[in-house]
């Protein structure tokens, strides 16, 4: 059956209704595009609002072909009178289109009545059906804005999209047209009437290409499906074989598709699959199969496989700079933990300022002054400057206390009404924490990590007070000092929890053991001398906050017993001692080390499965704590909550994950975890420091605030472009214009007048009607900013704006603003001509782009 897609210049639903009732008005039916097939009938169709199985048109009435004589109208490109359509209407076929709808809506049985009467008495149903199901455009503008503004683009896109029932969008079909032919014909002006419009669509030379284009487009569609199926397979193969976190998995998918479909690669793919006139129509789109998927492997997957494989990651991406020398002369804290002689001083901020001022005064002429305050105290602690007096060295720090021969720790302690800062080099840590009594009652044999952790009962307290002696052992924080070498890696690890997470004891300890295994393997690659069977990693967990649940708590024996009832996050503190004789200098290597540990935690399959089931893993190690003056809570200490009655809560309690080498002497391991010097950044060690690590770099993402995925995303989205003013200068020089401009404004205006505007003006004269082109015969330019200029037309010495470039409005006043925008695209400029019109039909002052011209690519 021959199919005609048509339009009207009046409300199509009412025009169709009048035809169905055989009482036609004087309106016209405009055949837009026709698909011929020998038949006694002609189907008149409209585009549907929804398409099932890619069927995008449906019939609204059927005519007898012989009575209608459609070929006459097509050959003469003439509209069909509604009366002629009504007279040739095939009532039987047309009735079948509406009868079921009418009967289902009315609930009546079919009556023996002529269709025209049935239609007449159900006008509202038919009008509602037509307006609800079909698109009813009444001007050429809709077709041009939807399918394309050039003759070939319009017709080929419309024919394939409406008639071929293929799973291709309009945008995709337009792309197929551009791949099929470089010449898409002349511009079809939006101001044309419907009669002028069908004169173009029914007489176009592009109608001869319908069959060939449909064949090509189907082959292109199949090739695209095959290409993208292979690309999906390549992306999924790596995704399934790697152990990415959920967040990284999403990032990876976006990066992979954007890498494979990057502009130059996609343009190259389009060129390869473009229509080749040297090949038969049935053998198109068969060159370089799987080019996109293969390019992804070269440009991303091979890099990802190295970065997300632990062995390759450390060999390829991790760069560690070490300084080995037995005479390094750098020292960590000197801090005694079982001393009956207590040298701890407690000062407020004001008292520290006065103490530093006194030190500066006493050392005047001997030592350079330091800033008063906490930073000055940290500098004095780390300073090894001394003066020689009678064969005796007097260090600057001894002005604070005569026994301070080596660096000392500085702590922040929270009291009831204030913070104080404490420093010194000795205390009785074990006695004051009650560890001596705890160790007496520990079992001698190792049973399990869980049993050992349950066996520890720490002395507890709940309230803040102003007694420094008590609070020193409940709310102490170590202040980081990057001038002192780091002997323990202290990691602040927060794992945000999913809403549905249920954390049993078995799950939690399995997670901790896997974290230990992952981190110790990474430690072995950084420090090859360690023994992974004995080297300790100390875990602490922030106690769950049970205050919200205490009143409502009732034990249900059927419920799974949870080890952790935290709802927002699991807070862990992890301490990994560096090998004896080794230290890290400064905070920057620690930030990079935290990023590395973040990454390796995502590489273990078992650990990733647990983390993905409970948490939102990713950048979990906090790198903000490695700045001089920043502090971190020490293991066994409490949080303070001033809003809840000055309560202590969230204590860092020990979680014992005993290495295999200490299973026969678990008490020794517990004593190590109770040793404060294993829990401080700069803790005291037995061996002198002979190796100093001063740089650790992940070459895949050297910036501390960016992950590897973030860096790849930024490289994709923030494509590096040459500055606009630099490109302007290059274009002026390339075209032989001496740029003697004294400012960027002069360069921009010179570029537009000499290079940009002649190109735009030629485009306007070629593709726009005379009414529009003539407005640009005499113009001047006003600079808005470094990338935008406004155009004004000049007449008889007067400057004014333009009349609308899209439509001829009633009145048609000169109130339309026209601009040129410059956009950098790699090594070239794109010129965009756009305007704003206040009329409602022009979207009320919204941006209307008229042309976009890419200038030639500049040579590097």
Swiss-Prot record:
Its EC number(s): 2.7.7.-
A Pfam family of this chain: Herpes_UL52
Keyword tags: DNA replication, Host nucleus, Metal-binding, Transferase, Zinc, Zinc-finger
InterPro entries from the UniProt entry: HSV_PRIM
Zinc finger (CHC2-type) boundaries: 804-842
Gene Ontology terms: cellular component: host cell nucleus
EC category: transferase
Record-level GO BP terms: bidirectional double-stranded viral DNA replication; DNA replication
UniProt main location, coarse: host cell
Subcellular location: Host nucleus
Subunit structure and binding partners: Associates with the helicase and the primase-associated factor to form the helicase-primase factor.
Name this protein carries in UniProt: DNA primase
Annotated organism of origin: Human herpesvirus 6B (strain Z29) (HHV-6 variant B)
Gene for this chain: U43
